[in-house]
Each structure stands twice: as C-alpha cells, then as structure tokens.
C-alpha cells in the first residue's frame, strides 16, 4: 500500500482517537465496511481490541491496544502473532509443475530439495515484477505458494492464463486455492519455544525456509519457518475451523509475552529488516535486479533464462541496472513514499518508496531507488520532505540484523 502501513496506522489511529466515525474512516481508506472480507479471526481481533481497517479488500487489524512502536519492540524482544489470512495460499500439482512454474518465476525451482522454499518473483514480459512470493517444493509434483493479498486477483489470472496454454500443449499441471485455510505468522525469539509446546515435531531440526506438514494443536498444518519481520518465526497454514483455537493456544502458551500484532507494526518490522513491500518498493516496472533481488535468480536460470522478461533481466545482470534499491538513514521528519532524493548538488537522483521511524534504532529509515553509481553505502544525499532538504546517507540493509534460524 502506498505510503506504508505504519503511516496508515498512525493516521487511522489519530482519526479514531479523535472520535472519528469508523465507517467514515473505512470510506476514506478505499472501501465500505460491507464490502470488506473478514478472516475467521475477525471477532477474535475485535474482542482483543483490534483497530480494524480496510486493507486489500479485507478488514484487518492495523494495531491493538499497544502502540505500533511498542508492538514492534515486543516482537523483537519476545514475539508477535499476526493474522495474515488475507494472503493467498495455493498448491500447484502435476508431473510438469516445476517446468510450468519456471516459465513464470526467476527461481531455480528444480534445484529445491523437498520441504524447502525460497523467495521468488513473478515477472512480466518486460522483466518487471508482477508480485513476489514464497514458493515451497513439497514434492517434485507439488509446489506450495503464498502470494500477496493485494495481488491475488492479478496473480491468479496470470497463473491461470499461462496454465491453460501450458495444458493445451499437453502439460500436466493443476491447482488448488486454499480458501479453506487460515494463515498465522508467529514471529520473534519466543516463537519456536512456544510453538514447540503444541507439536511433537522437533522444531530445532526445522531451519529457515523449510516446510513440513504436521500436527499442531490437533490440526494438520502447513508449517514454514519464514516470516516478514527479520526475526526467527513461522507461518502456519491451519484449517480455518481451527484458526481461532490455535491463536488462543499460542497466546496462552506464551504466558502473555507473545502479543497479537497488527499490520502497522508488521510494516515497521519489515522496513527495519530491509524487505520489499509490493506496491511500494517492488512494482510492475521494477526488475528483480533493480530491486536488489539478484540473489533470488538461480544460477541455472541465469544461464538458461526461460522465464518471462529473461532477456531484459539477464541484460541488466550483465551490464548493470540504471537504478538500484538502497536504504537510507535521515534527519528531520520521517521520509515518506514519493519523497524526492537529491545529490549534494541538488540534482534529482531518485525517490523514496518506503519510510518511517525505526522503533529499534530510534532513527528515521527509508528504502528507495537512486541512480547507479550513487548507491554505495556512505553516499550523502538530501531527502525532500514538505519542500525542505533533510540530510540523509545511503545505508546497508537490513537496518536491524536478521535472526533467521539457520544451521550453525
């Protein structure tokens, strides 16, 4: 969402705190309450003080009783439980499923071991990003994906269009959209010890990016050790009829240390981790190379291509892109999406795509794009906010060190 969820959260919180009508706020934020979809945890959120706002066609909690800053810090120190059921999980199956998906994404899907996954990007014919997605190889003929809520319709239409053409040529592939499941994200240092209380599976042997189908709290779940915060954690796909029960069990086992957390803190956490938000930092005119996601292009894919827009992307890989995604630390007010970036001579060199105040660093941080050659850490820039220049410096990302659970 343009401008960042943290900023949206602050704006909506102020409106509600000042006596703003919830329906009026909903209308201003793109949809009426009656038009919004609700996850199975909607009543659970409301009962726990969730401030519900429109997001990607859903009514979602932007925050709870804690401030966005306090929620961010608690995730880093203890843990957070997020309802991310608005995102779309789907399974692709068939003996030709790997070759099919490799036409649409940049990952080396064939090289993935069973039960492992990776971040990838769906690209268009011009090499731009249709969406980013976490893809997991369950088996050679079963892939599991999660795509962004705001991109669901276009992603599914894109996949379906290419699937029809692929099947018309004799390819064996089918799909199932997991609308019968809910998705919870458990993040933070207490995520693993708390979840361990609810499963017999030894989670110490499940590493970052790995996937299992297992029993959690009496329900068959899809468990991926991943997340969107930079912390260790899990995404749990649970049958929707057991979603509330699982959320309650996780909170109970944490003895109050893991807290329900909304989209506002989730955005500040991902910003501190230097991760892209589709619609801000990644869009249809931005390539994976420009976005700093070169690492996501498998070695074999760099040699063979074969995905949409490969000619553009591989040329950028060889020659270098004209713009690059970078991080910034700045003075003055927090940078906003679309804030102009200038060099020290006052020349336009780029634009901020995400920005805000870092609760952990107690500094303003931002992500944006600048001209190649001006992307190196330590480069001094000016960020224009409300017509005034503010000092900034290009900074390596992540801003806050990540704590992914990997083999030692």
UniProtKB/Swiss-Prot annotation:
It catalyses: N(6)-[(R)-S(8)-aminomethyldihydrolipoyl]-L-lysyl-[protein] + (6S)-5,6,7,8-tetrahydrofolate = N(6)-[(R)-dihydrolipoyl]-L-lysyl-[protein] + (6R)-5,10-methylene-5,6,7,8-tetrahydrofolate + NH4(+). Coiled coil: none annotated. GO terms for molecular function: aminomethyltransferase activity; transaminase activity. Keywords: Aminotransferase, Mitochondrion, Transferase, Transit peptide. GO terms for biological process: glycine decarboxylation via glycine cleavage system. Substrate binds at residues 235, 266, 404. Its main location: mitochondrion. Belongs to the GcvT family. The glycine cleavage system catalyzes the degradation of glycine. This is Aminomethyltransferase, mitochondrial.
